[in-house]
Design a protein with these regions (language model features):
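Predominant activation on well-ordered alpha-helical scaffold segments within soluble catalytic domains
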Residues: 2, 6, 58, 81, ...
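Broad gene-expression machinery/nucleic-acid interaction feature
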Residues: 32-34, 77-79, 134-136
Length: 207
């Protein structure tokens, strides 16, 4: 995905499967520490390490196979729940939230917001990539510039936030399954400033 994003002119975190290519780019100033070292095929932020020097990168690669190196983006992480109509193949809903707290790769606390610049970027990206149906996009706002981080072709763990804010993608799916085309509601179908917070619950019952 990194190669496709870079080729099509989208800002994204520099990514390397070859550590020697990464070290070479460090030498010429194309990337600097810290960086993330993580499994190329991973999930839930498992086995992700933040490396501050070459020795740490070498150590991590020596102890585990299938790793990649990714540029550290120091900015606000954003989640976007997007629905592309499966009849018209047009984007009909985008819900965006600022991630305020993360746990095990999932959003623990977030607040909804809207930005036309971000909506325009998502629409352009989705059309060029050719996605369809429900997708979940991770984005970073770094000094006012949006970087696309990753895309998952499914509902994200924080989708209940979108649903409770008004972005009912379940209804959109039902309409499409019935052969009905959905109307575009980008920027119109949810409220700004809605917070979502997850919590753990414990119940003790005495016999």
């Amino acid at each position: 995905m990194y190669n496709w994003l870079a080729k099509n002119g989208y800002k994204c975190a520099k990514s390397y499967m070859d550590k020697d290519a990464f070290f070479a780019d460090v030498e010429v100033g194309l990337i600097s520490y810290p960086v993330f070292v993580k499994p190329a095929r991973g999930s839930a932020s498992i086995s992700i390490s933040k490396a501050y020097d070459k020795e740490t990168v070498e150590l991590l690669f020596a102890h585990e196979d299938g790793l990649m190196i990714q540029e550290f983006l120091n900015g606000q992480e954003i989640g976007a729940d997007v629905y592309i109509d499966m009849v018209s193949h047009e984007i009909v809903s985008i819900f965006t939230k600022k991630k305020l707290k993360m746990r095990a790769g999932e959003t623990d606390k977030a607040v909804s917001f809207k930005d036309k610049k971000l909506f325009d970027l998502i629409e352009d990206f989705v059309k060029k990539a050719g996605y369809n149906g429900q997708i979940d996009i991770d984005i970073f706002d770094v000094n006012g510039e949006y970087y696309i981080s990753e895309v998952n072709p499914r509902f994200g763990g924080g989708y209940p936030h979108a649903y409770e804010s008004g972005a009912n993608h379940m209804c959109l799916i039902v309409n499409n399954l019935a052969g009905r085309e959905n109307e575009c509601a980008v920027g119109k179908n949810y409220k700004v400033g809605t917070y979502m917070m997850k919590y753990n619950e414990i119940m003790i019952q005495h016999s």
